[in-house]
Amino acid sequence: MSWWSGVWRSVWSALSREVREHVGTDHLGNKYYYVAEYKNWRGQTIREKRIVEAANRKEVDYEAGDIPTEWEAWIRRTRKTPPTMEEILKNEKYREEIKIKSQDFYEKDKLGKETSEELLPSPTATQVKGHASAPYFGREEPSVAPTSTGKTFQPGSWTPEDGKRQSQ
């Protein structure tokens, strides 16, 4: 840190009236601060801030899970009070239990599928044509010439000649 940046920081802290209140630290080493609403030297009201000072200072080193969920909720203002260390540890223990239970369930389900596959015969290949609600009796495709008349009339197929319109 250069000498000028130190001078600038001390001048800025004297003018800003921003007072950081240390609220807590998590088990990963991140520090959390609260800055109450205040008026700056120009008379503007600056709203409250909630700040995290990460243990690893580079943004590039950030990975999901570096900030516990409870602290993240406090920073985003979805929770009013900062979490306690006991609460964070209790929730992490609960997440681990859920992970173990889901893994057990997955293994039991996989075992159940293997035994049911042995009991059931393999499905036969079916031919699907048309809409599911319409019965298919092996009808032929429409022919070029129309067939029959009246109620059993089926039109013939049609192909356009060329893209030019005929004028009348």
From Swiss-Prot:
<keyword id="KW-0496">Mitochondrion</keyword>
<keyword id="KW-0970">Cilium biogenesis/degradation</keyword>
<dbReference type="GO" id="GO:0032981">
    <property type="term" value="P:mitochondrial respiratory chain complex I assembly"/>
</dbReference>
<dbReference type="GO" id="GO:0005739">
    <property type="term" value="C:mitochondrion"/>
</dbReference>
<comment type="function">
    <text>Acts as a molecular chaperone for mitochondrial complex I assembly. Complex I functions in the transfer of electrons from NADH to the respiratory chain. The immediate electron acceptor for the enzyme is believed to be ubiquinone. Is involved in the initial steps of cilia formation, including removal of CP110 from the mother centrioles, docking of membrane vesicles to the mother centrioles, and establishment of the transition zone.</text>
</comment>
<dbReference type="GO" id="GO:0045271">
    <property type="term" value="C:respiratory chain complex I"/>
</dbReference>
<comment type="subunit">
    <text>Interacts with ARMC9.</text>
</comment>
<feature type="region of interest" description="Disordered">
    <location>
        <begin position="112"/>
        <end position="168"/>
    </location>
</feature>
<feature type="compositionally biased region" description="Polar residues">
    <location>
        <begin position="145"/>
        <end position="157"/>
    </location>
</feature>
<comment type="similarity">
    <text>Belongs to the complex I NDUFA12 subunit family.</text>
</comment>
<dbReference type="GO" id="GO:0044877">
    <property type="term" value="F:protein-containing complex binding"/>
</dbReference>
<dbReference type="GO" id="GO:0061179">
    <property type="term" value="P:negative regulation of insulin secretion involved in cellular response to glucose stimulus"/>
</dbReference>
<dbReference type="Pfam" id="PF05071">
    <property type="entry name" value="NDUFA12"/>
</dbReference>
<dbReference type="GO" id="GO:0060271">
    <property type="term" value="P:cilium assembly"/>
</dbReference>
<keyword id="KW-0143">Chaperone</keyword>
<protein>
    <recommendedName>
        <fullName>NADH dehydrogenase [ubiquinone] 1 alpha subcomplex assembly factor 2</fullName>
    </recommendedName>
</protein>
<dbReference type="InterPro" id="IPR007763">
    <property type="entry name" value="NDUFA12"/>
</dbReference>
<dbReference type="InterPro" id="IPR052618">
    <property type="entry name" value="ComplexI_NDUFA12"/>
</dbReference>
<keyword id="KW-0809">Transit peptide</keyword>
<feature type="modified residue" description="Phosphoserine">
    <location>
        <position position="133"/>
    </location>
</feature>
<keyword id="KW-0597">Phosphoprotein</keyword>
